[in-house]
Amino acid sequence: MKKAIFLDRDGTLNIDHGYVHEIDQFQFIDGSIEALQQLKAMGYLLVLVTNQSGIARGYFSEDQFLQLTEWMDWSLADRGVDLDGIYYCPHHTEGKGEYCQDCDCRKPKPGMLLQAIKELNIDPNTSFMVGDKVEDMLAGKGAKIKNTVLVKTGKPITEDGKKQANYVLESIADLPKLIKGLKS
């Protein structure tokens, strides 16, 4: 089984400007790409798990999301970072049409993580879930991910978020150092 870093997107990898769906809105958080390079070098799979309710709400299309995701994936690949899995939830209970559903994939439910664990043969005991909200921490716990990491680069940190997180970091840039410290 493989070890993995499960990554939220908005507020964790990129600045959350609210419903980011255009390339010109997308800015990687300082140090995030370098952190991903280090995590890759440490032997971790990198798995994106992102809620995208903007699709359900009609703010942007699934095609627009997929185009931005392809651009992000290529931008990372150009810097030597390959994402091993990309999982997203386009649903919301207040969504429109086919996207209006109470699904198992929308965080805080663990559906996306459980699917990745199964498809990519991931060991939850050696893996980390990284995100900026309590929903990310709850999804990690629901999937039995041993380590949940809350980052301060997105939504304001809540007491609930702190309680659910094993670790709270300034940003994902600090994650490789944390992991190295845990191993020593």
From Swiss-Prot:
Q: Where in the cell is it found?
A: Cytoplasm
Which residues of this protein are annotated with the site description Stabilizes the phosphoryl group?
Answer: T50, K107
Instruction: State the Gene Ontology BP annotations.
Output: ADP-L-glycero-beta-D-manno-heptose biosynthetic process; lipopolysaccharide core region biosynthetic process
Primary subcellular site in the record, as a coarse category: cytoplasm
Q: In which pathway does it act?
A: Nucleotide-sugar biosynthesis; ADP-L-glycero-beta-D-manno-heptose biosynthesis; ADP-L-glycero-beta-D-manno-heptose from D-glycero-beta-D-manno-heptose 7-phosphate: step 2/4; Bacterial outer membrane biogenesis; LPS core biosynthesis
- Pfam families noted in UniProt: Hydrolase_like (PF13242)
Tell me its EC number(s), please: 3.1.3.82
Cofactors named for this entry = Mg(2+); Zn(2+)
Listed binding positions for Zn(2+) are C89, H91, C103, C105
UniProt-annotated binding residues for substrate: D8, R9, D10, D16, H17, G18, Y19, T50, N51, Q52, S53, R106, K107, K133
Entry-linked InterPro entries? HAD-like_sf (IPR036412), HAD-SF_hydro_IIIA (IPR006549), HAD_sf (IPR023214), Heptose_bisP_phosphatase (IPR004446), Histidinol-phos (IPR006543)
Supply the enzyme class, top level: hydrolase
Positions of Mg(2+) binding: D8, D10, D132
Q: Which GO terms describe its molecular function?
A: D-glycero-beta-D-manno-heptose 1,7-bisphosphate 7-phosphatase activity; magnesium ion binding; zinc ion binding
Please list the residues that make up the active site.
Answer: D8 (nucleophile), D10 (proton donor)
Reaction catalyzed: D-glycero-beta-D-manno-heptose 1,7-bisphosphate + H2O = D-glycero-beta-D-manno-heptose 1-phosphate + phosphate
Q: Superkingdom of the source?
A: Bacteria
Q: Assembly and interactions?
A: Monomer.
The record's similarity note reads:
Belongs to the GmhB family.
Task: Provide the protein name.
Answer: D-glycero-beta-D-manno-heptose-1,7-bisphosphate 7-phosphatase
What is the organism of origin for this protein?
A: Pasteurella multocida (strain Pm70)
